Amino acid sequence: MNMKALKQQVGFTLIELMIVIMIVAILAAIAIPSYRQFVVRNAESQVQARMQELDIELNRWRASALTYKGFTPKKVASNGDVSYVYDATDNKTIYVPKGSDSTNFHYKITLVDATTGSTLAPASTGYSTAGSSWRMFAEPNSNYSTAHKIILNSAGLRCKTKNNDSSITVASTNCGTYSEEW
């Protein structure tokens, strides 16, 4: 009996390994962009929900104070403590998701008086504001290049536009030519 005939092949051939590598590469090429889109959509959903929460808080404030002047957003810490404060010293900025700051945010919401463009914060801060209307502008972190810029105001405007439209700012009264409602 021939000893070579009894030996069985052990391991994989080069062609089998190349086929497995190609399959993994194809799956990665499909999965990674889909995951990135999911992350961006999730961040957009979070900021839209936070903007709607702020809208409700603003309307409650106005119902009791008869003006938006003096409004500060509710902030809930991870341990459940509640405070009323903006996330930045300019008294206009709110970072999303909750608990994030200027180094790790997904979206930055700027909340201003629609008439003056200044903060709605209490007058003791030295800012001047009319308090009759407000405007929110959410801008994505630079890591989310495909995300939308989002606008919500007290007049009922709800729109979003692609992030690469640099003409859309907190002072904008609409979302531009290629906008959509949300």
Regions found by a protein language model. Give the residues of each.
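N-terminal leader/signal peptides at the extreme start of proteins
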Residues: 1-12
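Short coil/loop residues immediately preceding or within conserved phosphate-binding loops
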Residues: 9, 21, 133
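Residue-level signal for short amphipathic helical patches enriched in basic/charged
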Residues: 9, 27-30, 42-45
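Internal alpha-helical transmembrane segments of multi-pass membrane proteins, especially GPCRs
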Residues: 10, 15-19, 40
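Alpha-helical hydrophobic helix detector
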Residues: 17-34
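Alpha-helix exit/C-cap motif
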Residues: 36, 41-45, 52-77
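Periplasmic/extracellular, small/polar-rich flexible segments of pilin-like filament-forming proteins
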Residues: 64-182
